[in-house]
UniProtKB/Swiss-Prot annotation:
Family of the protein in this entry: Belongs to the TMEM39 family.
Name of the molecule in the record: Transmembrane protein 39B
A cellular component term, taken from the record's GO annotations: membrane
Localization annotation: Endoplasmic reticulum membrane
Entry function: May protect the cells against DNA damage caused by exposure to the cold-warming stress and facilitates tissue damage repair during the recovery phase.
Comp. bias intervals (Low complexity): 31-54
InterPro entries per record: Uncharacterised_TMEM39
Encoding gene per record: TMEM39B
Region (Disordered): 1-54
Protein origin, superkingdom: Eukaryota
Residues the record marks as carrying a glycan: N8
Sorted UniProt keywords: Endoplasmic reticulum, Glycoprotein, Membrane, Transmembrane, Transmembrane helix
């Protein structure tokens, strides 16, 4: 019977599931090479609520067998940046059509126009600055490829130096010339609107984890009034922050070239450390996606409109719609590049090793054995543990996550299923394409028809690559799931 424990009632011993350090050690290779030794313990009789602690006398943590996914082709960084730059130029071109379109087909009695655009109204210096900002990633990839270090011939080294010098000189000269003209032509408010995103760049991409490791800000915060640093030292700290932020940004700029690795180990502390590193890396990639997408949409949709004369008419609704289309399309393309199939599989492996805990009502398991949670143990599936005055049930094959850590729960939720990110991107890109097709069929304006038709081509290519990866990986993971089910049945 349930109820409160009286003074004469026998108290069961609650031994930990495993001794500290029994699950340590790391194993390389593709699968976990050892399993955690099961520990015998007593269980109470169930209270009839459906919750029960499994018999641990014969339980063994089943070793994970990771799926071997095929090597999918990964686009080279410079080719991807060229493709992204081309898509952004198309979006910028169709927006200029929306703003500066003419009625060239009208009869001569109306104001004559021999071209489809009012080219005399376009500020080509503003167009040059916008193009350079949109092509910053492509320019950076060219400079990176031309800055390769290694054993190269004299002719190749001279060619790479000339390429790097030409690209940087042409970009710098064009940017300085256009900015000088803009400073002479427009007001300070217009220039502030033009440069506003770059002022928000450093605060958004601030190095939270790396700065805590280097104790850059904690050292300044711990100083007393008499130990205040000088202005030069503060400027050096800011320059160090700027340099480290730019270093991390350029590292994430070429995602597939700097892919982290997975250590298939059985040490709980090492697994949690690996998950923390992967969380930081994933957050950096998502920040890069968000910043690049918003920056592209801002300079494609908002900047050309801001510098238009007040007497000039344009379709404001279409400009806002173009902002959403460019931001979503750019986000999907960047996520497809920065989160390839191998990276998503890496996150899935780490989530499988981490495990997850489900919070249960203590009243429903008052007569079920509850082990005190310890961080040195790997807990098998179905075990109840007590942590921070709450009761949790193990969900994964084996679990080393901290039960009260919400970030561990989120990590396991997003990456426990390896195709979840790919499915989200596929649905998002498919929804954008369906909306564009609907807008194309219902549009009665020639400039919108041309704009939607051109933007659709870039989305078609991204959707094709996502669908190809989804079909191939779906077959691979379904075969692995059947094999894992047979292995679990053999162990049980």
């Amino acid at each position: 019977m349930g109820g409160r424990r009286g003074p004469n009632r026998t108290s069961y011993c609650r031994n930990p599931l495993c001794e500290p350090g029994s699950s340590g050690g790391s194993g390389g290779g593709h699968t976990s090479s050892a399993s955690v030794t099961s520990v015998r313990s007593r269980t109470r009789s169930s209270s009839g609520t459906g919750l029960s602690s499994p018999p641990l006398a014969t339980q063994t943590v089943v070793p994970l067998q990771h799926c071997k996914i095929p090597e999918l082709p990964v686009q080279a960084s410079i080719l991807f940046e060229l493709q992204l730059f081309f898509c952004q130029l198309i979006a910028l071109f169709v927006h200029y059509i929306n703003i500066y379109k003419t009625v060239w087909w009208y009869p001569p009695s109306h104001p004559p126009s021999h071209t489809s655009l009012n080219f005399h109204l376009i500020d080509f210096n503003l167009l040059m600055v916008t193009t350079i900002v949109l092509g910053r990633r492509f320019i950076g990839s060219i400079v990176k490829e031309a800055s390769q270090r290694g054993k190269v011939t004299l002719f190749r080294s001279i060619l790479l130096f000339l390429t790097r010098f030409t690209v940087l000189t042409a970009t710098g000269w064009s940017l300085c010339r256009s900015l000088i003209h803009l400073f002479r032509t427009y007001s300070f408010l217009n220039l502030l609107f033009l440069c506003y995103p770059f002022g928000m760049y450093i605060p958004f991409l601030q190095l939270n984890c790396d700065l805590r490791k280097t104790n850059l800000f904690s050292h300044v915060a711990s100083m007393g009034p008499r130990e205040a640093v000088s202005g030069l030292a503060r400027s050096r700290d800011y320059l160090l922050t700027l340099r480290e932020t730019w270093k991390q940004h350029t590292k994430q700029l070429y995602g597939p070239d700097a892919m982290p690795t997975h250590a298939c180990c059985l040490s709980p502390s090492l697994i949690r450390s690996e998950v923390e590193f992967l969380k930081m890396d994933f957050n950096w990639r998502m920040k890069e996606v968000l910043v690049s997408a918003m920056l592209s949409a801002y300079y494609v949709a908002f900047v050309p409109v801001w510098f238009v004369k007040n007497t000039h008419y344009y379709d404001k609704r279409w400009s806002c719609e173009l902002f959403l289309l460019v931001s979503i399309s750019t986000s999907v393309i960047l996520m497809q590049h920065l989160l390839p199939a191998s990276y998503c599989d890496l996150l899935h492996k780490a989530a499988a090793h981490l495990g997850c805990w489900q919070k249960v009502d203590p009243a429903l398991c008052s007569n079920v054995l509850q082990h005190p949670w310890t961080e040195e143990c790997m807990w098998p599936q179905g075990v109840l543990v007590k942590h921070s005055k709450n009761v949790y049930k193990a969900v994964g094959h084996y679990n080393v996550a901290i039960p009260s850590d919400v970030s561990h729960f989120r990590f396991h939720f997003f990456f426990s299923k390896p195709l979840r990110i790919l499915n989200i991107l596929l649905l998002l890109e498919g929804a954008v394409i369906v909306y564009q097709l609907y807008s194309l069929m219902s549009s009665d304006k020639w400039h919108q028809t041309i704009s939607l038709a051109l933007i659709l081509f870039s989305n078609y290519y991204a959707f094709f690559k996502l669908l190809r990866d989804r079909l191939v990986l779906g077959k691979a993971y379904s075969y692995s799931a059947n094999s894992q089910r047979d292995l679990d049945h053999r162990f049980s």
